[in-house]
Structures are given as C-alpha cells and as structure tokens.
Amino acid sequence: MKTSRGYIFTAFVAVFAGTFAFSAIAPAHAQQRKSLRWATSAVGSYGYNVAAAMTKLVEEALGGEYTVTVQPYTSPTVAMKSVMDGNGEIAYTADIGMTEFHQRIGGFKGYKPKMPEIVHSWYAYPMESIMATTAARAAQFKCWKDFSGKPVFYTNAGFMNWLNWQRIYKALGYEFKHVQIDLKANADALQAGSIVGSATYTTAGRSLAAYWKETELRMDIRIINPCPEEVAKIKAAGLAVVEVDPKQAFSKDVGVKTAVGVPILFGYNVGLNISENIVYKLLGAFYKNKDNLAKTDPGFTPMAKDFIGMQVQGINANPDIAVHPGLARFLKEHKAWSEKWKIAG
C-alpha cells in the first residue's frame, strides 16, 4: 500500500509539474507573436472599419505569427507619417496621398521619414468625392461654385477626400473654405448652419462611411452635382469624373437620379521593413477571399471583379514610386508586371 501511495503521489506530482510547465510555456508562446500595427484614419471612417474587419484574415494569412492591432489617427496623412516614424507597419493611404508624399508637398512638405518609405503594396477600393447639403438649404446650390468661399466640412483635414477636394477646387479656381468638426457632429453642424455643405463619399459607388449613415438617418440631405462646365474643367485638369447610383449607397432619396463625383483609389501600403514574403502572403489571401470580401462589404466589389487591374491602376497613378517586392512577385506570377515600373530596394 505504501508503494502504491508513493506511486500515486509521484504520478500526481509529475502530472502537476507537466501541467504547470505547459501553462508556463503557453503564455511564452503567445508573447512570441509579433505585432503588426495597422494605422488607419479616424474611428467611424471607412478606412478604419475595413482594417478592423480584416484583422482576423490577416492574422490567419500569416499563420498566427502576428497580432494585428488597428490604430486610428486623425487622417491618412498622419497615419502614413506614423508608420514611417516607426509607430506602425501598415499605412492607410490613397493615390493622391502617395503623390503628395513622393513630391513632399502639402502635409509632407519638409517631412523626413525615420523608417523606410512606404511603397506600392496593396490597393483595395475606389472612393468617390461627392457634395451634399440639407434638403432645406438645397435650393441655394445649383453647382459646386455655389460652395466656393462658404463654410463646408470637406471630411477631416488630412483625409484623402479632403485633399481630393483641394485639387478639385484648384482645377475649378474656387475658394476652399474648410470648417473642421468632429465626424459625429456632421448632422448637428449642418442643421445649425455652422456649415452649409458637407462632402460625402461613397466606396465603389455603394458603401457610406459610418458617420454619413448616421447623418442621413437623422436628416434629409440633397446631393449637389457639378454643372457641365465644371465637369469639363475637372476632366481638363486630368481628373476623372464618375456617376454613382445614389440608391446603391443612400437609404433615402437625395434629390438626384445620378450623383456625380471625382474618384480616388485607396490602399494600405508598407515599407521595406515588412518582408517580401509577408506582403506576398497577404496579397494571396486577399486575392483568394476577394469574392467573400465583396459579399461582406460592397465597397470591395471593384477589387473582386478585377483584383489585378486595381493593383496596376494604383501603381500607374504614381509610376515613379517603387513597388514592394511582395507585390512585384505577385504581379509577375499573374503576368501583370510592367518593366516600366521599379521594384523597391
């Protein structure tokens, strides 16, 4: 009996020790997961919502070796700088933001990155910059010129749509008078008259940002389209003009059968501190899941229809900017690489 008890006690100690050892190892293993910080625009913006919804897909694509955290900033411009200052790995950006960074103009004037510069990595969806006002005030506005010099919220300062409106107004010769407000105050500011208009935007002609969904539920709005002569000037400046079916994006009547906007292409870019293999794996996962992504969010519809073409479009918008080796490898495999482009590194 002594021997039996001694055996049982020894076995119990062995099991307990094994359990303790395993529980000690598990946290250590968890701690070994690397951090992948995804810098986006403000909470409530479309860019933030997309990143937050894709963290699980990214973590799975990288074999569980990384923990993805979404870090919101006041604008994509600030998010881009944060990544290049070493405070993140993936930067939310757009074609116009990449142009300004490359040329060191606008918010990037005099800017010197502390980390590798972000390069073409992944382009995800187009957005269309559109102008709106209240139904009660709509009769005062016939064209975009009627907003010139008047207080308007052109999305957050530094947002890519904000930059887009600056280049639109430059092409039209209009005065850009921006009033900065909190995203959640959009409806209140419109109702109070502290702003007479507010720039809205659709993603792929379908999805609305969260704060605009709230705005249209709280009040009746009207879309104000550019007049034909304004459209001609915008196109003459080299910018595209697209038509959007408002029924695809808005839940209520907005006063027009077709909304007219100026598009920009958004993406999430990284620097060479992120390896070729990581970017290649992510692109492969996004490509494989493109149809499911489009079902989850209609904003991904254009990407699902032509994933490769969207990457080509993003590069061609700024052909002087280098392409991440991971994207270059992906495009070469899909016979879509151009020798006119250069690979970063």
What do the PLM-derived regions correspond to, one by one?
Residues 33-61, 66-69, 127-194, 203-206, ...:
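Bilobed "Venus flytrap"/periplasmic-binding protein-like clamshell domains
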Residues 143, 148-167, 238-308:
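Ligand-binding clefts/hinges and TM-proximal coupling segments of bilobed small-molecule sensing domains
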Residues 185, 202-223, 233-235, 277-345:
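An extracytoplasmic/periplasmic, membrane-proximal ligand-sensing/linker region
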Residues 55-63, 84-88, 103, 136, ...:
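Sec-exported extracytoplasmic/periplasmic mature domains
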Residues 1-15:
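Bacterial N-terminal signal peptides that target proteins for export
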Residues 76-80, 186-189:
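Short, hydrophobic alpha-helical packing/hinge segments within bilobed ligand-binding/sensory domains
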Residues 95-97, 104-113, 119-120, 135-137, ...:
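Pocket-lining segment of extracytoplasmic ligand-binding domains
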Residues 16-28:
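C-terminal segment of classical bacterial N-terminal signal peptides
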